[in-house]
Amino acid sequence: MKEYRLTDWLPTTKKEIELRGWDSVDVILFSADAYVDHPSFGAAVIGRTLEAAGYTVAIVPQPDWHGDFRDFKKLGRPNLFFGIAPGCMDSMVNKYTAGKRLRSEDAYSPDGRHDCRPEYPTIVYTKILKQLFPDVPVVLGGIEASLRRLTHYDYWKDSLQKCILCDSGADMIIYGMGEKPIVELCRNLAEGLPISAVHDIPQTVYLCREKEIPNGIGDDDIVLHSHEECLRNKKAQADNFRHIEEESNKMHAQRLLQAVDNKYAVVNPPYPPMTSDELDRSFDLPYTRLPHPKYKGKRIPAYEMIKFSVNLHRGCFGGCAFCTISAHQGKFIACRSKRSIVEEVKKVIDMPDFKGYLSDLGGPSANMYGMHGNNPKACAVCKRPSCIHPQVCPNLNTDHSKLLEIYHAVDALPGIKKSFIGSGVRYDLLLHRSKDEAINAVARQYTRELITKHVSGRLKVAPEHTSDAVLKLMRKPSFKLFGEFKCIFDRINREEHLNQQIIPYFISSHPGCREEDMAELAVLTKQLDFHLEQVQDFTPTPMTVSTETWYTGYDPYTLEPVFSAKTPREKLAQRQFFFWYKPEERRAIEQELRRIGRADLIQKLYAGVPAPNYGRNFGNNRRPEFERRDGRDEMDTRDSRKGRNNRNNKSGYKGRKPKW
């Protein structure tokens, strides 16, 4: 184990800056997460990237936003700008449940304290900095700002909100994975350009008047419905989102413009996907992989989850309707080299408390490493949000060979007893039949090796629902494929004399889902002998198709009306079907089935199950409508559904690693 000094972390105090011999810093980052010097934490990635580019950087983690703002003043004025890194998860998903109850724990804070970050830290921190240092630029990054770069629906305010630049007063957003644009911005500002003149950096968002738009509004620009029009017309908001999502998933995107408050929000197209060399350089930076020494003796839950995990790639071409990964990372897969991955695993092996077990060797999805289009020219003109829905694209190379090579190289290292695949396996990719029989053979090999060598006892997969109509709106494969995969999983377990479980994830109250769909879900999962655990109520989060459908009532691609359960009563009526096997739920479920005209399902659910004694006080032990079934926050019982905004955030903390 390498011995680290205080100066091995980026400085967080004036004293630490002086220890480095600096008299000022170029960039000061304010983070709403605890400072963990690890490639899964966005502030660390941006700080290390700027350091490698020759700039001096300091981090102020979780500043106190009350009182005299001393945490915002303690490092003084930066030479270039303040950066806001609001955290790996959307702050409102982090703080509140789907039922808008305060969560009992903040996974990104020391000892899980839930009072270390404000609501919307992007806005709170920026307003304080602009009050204290009005002439210093403030640049936003991270999942919270990235997904609020244009007009968006805010579930917690239950209203349509403007581009977050309007509410915060910041000067610029760097959206998505920000290593390349942040360095380019520093170069521009270091050369003396005012930030108001920096308009040509890809992957940035800024506000300006129409006459100030570089090159004016051209034929290649996409002019969205104005914020004011979206307030008046929900169909306009739905129509906007189709363009926003398409441009987020194109290799050569167009510039987006949206009028708001007598100005335009200008969204420059993103950089091309990072090359392997570029991604390696980011992951090879000199991270300590440890929390800052200031947290000695304190537990940071998110770090505990990922400290023995390694990320293989960025991007996801699944295109799930409730997920923000493609909006933040894009659908094109950027892979690390085998060398870079193995070197990081060696660093994990050297950690003093490592016992030989890697908790996760994956990415946004577990088995997309090395996959790409066979014909790059076809990908260059494609604007499909998903490469595998409604069918696997014939141009997609689904070869798992490169991923197997990574597994074999890692498992061969001295000190590795076993590497687990924590979650996110796309079984539709494993079951897809290619025209190339060699690829099919590798898929079968991968499936067997996954089940026999990389499961910790429970393999988590995400069918999400059983209704094909709901799954179509979710952009997920038919539930029949889950049944096929479960048969394969069970067969291999029998052949190898293993006693492992497959754990399915499900969502209730997704747009298009009604009580009857949930009732049939209960029947089908009962027939498969599941007592569901990993379940959650749909939470609308910014910049997903599902959220736009939920808010507007229209499918953004067809503009056809779509039903959504919105009231607490409607949501509870759906959610209770997950727990049909609990005696305290039975009476309410039977009543609901009779109400919707599906009394025939009562027999299918409860045949042979003695009816409980419906005494006077029966059902008093039912949980409140939005409380978790384990007695903590609410019924969102999925463990670390992060990265996908708790799968609707696809920023979370297990195998989902959003950064600037």
Region locations from a protein language model:
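Nucleic acid-processing catalytic cores of prokaryotic defense/repair systems
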Residues: 25-31, 38-79
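Conserved SAM/AdoMet-binding glycine-rich loop
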Residues: 29, 45, 59-60, 65-68, ...
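Glycine-rich beta-alpha loop elements in corrinoid/cobalamin-binding modules
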Residues: 42, 61-260, 267-273
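Flexible glycine/acidic-rich beta-alpha junction loops that bind and position SAM and/or redox cofactors
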Residues: 90-99, 147-149, 179-184, 209-213, ...
